[in-house]
A protein has these predicted regions:
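Extracytoplasmic gate region of multi-pass secondary transporters
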Residues: 33, 238-287, 381
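C-terminal transmembrane helical hairpin of 12-TM major facilitator-type secondary transporters
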Residues: 306-351
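Multi-pass alpha-helical transporter architecture, strongest
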Residues: 203-210, 407-425
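Cytoplasmic membrane-interface "Motif A"-like loop-to-helix N-cap segments
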Residues: 81-93, 301-312
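Extracellular/periplasmic helix-loop-helix junction of adjacent transmembrane segments
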Residues: 36-68
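Glycine-rich segments within core transmembrane alpha-helices of 12-TM secondary carriers
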Residues: 152-176, 373-384
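C-terminal ends and interior cores of transmembrane alpha-helices
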Residues: 93-111, 314-328
Length: 425
């Protein structure tokens, strides 16, 4: 009786279980991001000029960020009440079904205005699923971690972001290289959405093999049960919610400026062909992946808060260089820009999950960490690509950099107000 849980909660099982789910979730999320720039403006929003169509497409992209806090509240409630395992499986299925459905949607030419409406509904479902996935995956890792390695364990689910992005970008690159533009726009773009069902099956199988974390089991035995975790958060952990949210804003903004905005601006305004734009993105993501574990190691040595403050200051400075890198179609400058931005993203993203989770006790941690992370997504990412494109088109790309610098200053203030990690384990 005692050996089975220990076997299932081995280091390999825990870390791979936390990584595979976020990889699948972010793959699903990013294939939508690529399609929102490369495909959806023509298929779901015809009749407008290219800039307006792109903005309309990116508006559907933002819907997921608005629905993610709903997923956080819903799945967080059950994750704190009945356990991490069941909730992680349910969140994965919600995201997966929504993504696969997009692959079967007819275009505007076939069913008219119903097409973008159905697209928005599926995007809403993606957001709900991801809102419940991230927090649970992080907790699966850090609630099984020794105290001196929480950032290291917590970075494994964070690695799902660059891996998912590499898979999605690589898939789109392969498809655009292997078929004509007409075939790609006709049916090729659907392949990644439908094929994601295979990844969901793998993730579902692995998640069903995971047992509850020791922290959750101890919490059920030793603490009073919280009837409504969300209400407890608002009543007793309001400061952690507010300042944790603002602390994470810059992480979201820098990422979506480096991916969605940079890909859109480079291919539509700087004259870089789509294939080269995708190659730049894929290459820069390697820096994202490399610096996630680097930042986790540093964070375990000097503290999560201190590591995040250093990264945020660097991002604020980086904002002043947008004009230098993005004022021309020089592919070397654009690539350098993307690589620096993604490296900074790795520095801030690696320890973030651990930092946010340590702000809350076990019985509301799923809800608390998920809500702070996903509310930051609304503020930092929901409308970021649209705002950035508008700023760059109306004024110049230097204003996009200023946008990032201002956000970084807000996050820096939040980190300074949060005086120390609370380690509520």
């Amino acid at each position: 009786m005692e050996t089975t849980p220990k076997k299932k909660n081995s280091l390999k099982h825990v870390l791979f279980g936390s990584l595979i789910g976020t990889t699948i979730e972010f793959f699903d999320f990013y294939i939508y991001a690529n399609a929102a720039v490369l495909v959806f403006p023509q298929l779901f929003f015809p009749g407008s000029n290219s800039t307006i169509a792109t903005l309309e497409s990116l508006a559907t992209f933002s819907i997921a960020f608005l629905s993610r806090p709903l997923g956080s509240a819903f799945f967080g409630h059950y994750g704190d009440k009945i356990g991490r395992k069941f909730t992680l499986v349910a969140a994965l299925l919600t995201m997966g079904i929504s993504t696969v459905t997009i692959g079967f949607l007819p275009s505007y030419a076939s069913i008219g205005v119903a097409a973008p409406l159905l697209l928005m509904l599926c995007r809403f479902g993606q957001g709900v699923g991801l809102g419940g996935e991230w927090g649970g995956a992080v907790l699966l890792a850090i609630e099984n971690a020794p105290p001196n390695k929480r950032a290291w364990y917590g970075m494994f689910p964070q690695l799902g972001a660059p891996i998912g992005l590499l898979l999605s970008g690589g898939t789109f690159l392969f498809l655009t290289d292997s078929m004509s533009n007409e075939d790609f726009m006709d049916y090729g773009w659907r392949i990644p959405f439908i094929a994601s069902s295979l990844l969901v099956v793998i993730g579902f199988y692995i998640r069903t093999k995971i047992t509850e974390t020791p922290s959750f089991e101890n919490s059920k035995k030793e603490q009073e049960e919280v009837n409504v975790p969300f209400l407890t958060l608002v009543k007793s952990y309001k400061n952690q919610l507010i300042f944790g949210t603002f602390a994470a804003v810059t992480t979201f903004l820098v990422f979506y400026l480096m991916t969605v905005f940079t890909l859109s601006w480079a291919t539509s305004d700087l004259g870089i062909v789509k294939r080269d734009g995708l190659l730049i993105q894929l290459f820069s993501v390697l820096f994202f992946a490399i610096f996630i574990p680097v930042s986790a190691v540093v964070a375990d040595k000097i503290g999560r808060r201190k590591m995040l403050i250093i990264a945020t200051v660097a991002i604020a400075i980086f904002g002043f260089f947008f004009s230098y890198f993005l004022s021309s179609g020089n592919i070397v400058l654009v690539t350098t820009f993307a690589c620096i931005g993604m490296a900074l993203m790795g520095f801030t993203y690696g320890p973030l999950g651990t930092f946010l989770s340590e702000l809350f006790p076990t019985n509301v941690r799923y809800s608390g960490a998920s809500l702070t992370f996903n509310m930051a997504g609304i503020l930092g990412a929901a409308f970021a690509p649209m705002i950035a494109i508008w700023l760059a088109s109306t004024y110049s790309v230097s204003y996009v950099g200023l946008y990032l610098t201002i956000a970084a200053c807000i996050s820096l203030f939040a980190f300074l107000v949060i005086s120390k990690e609370e380690h509520r384990f």
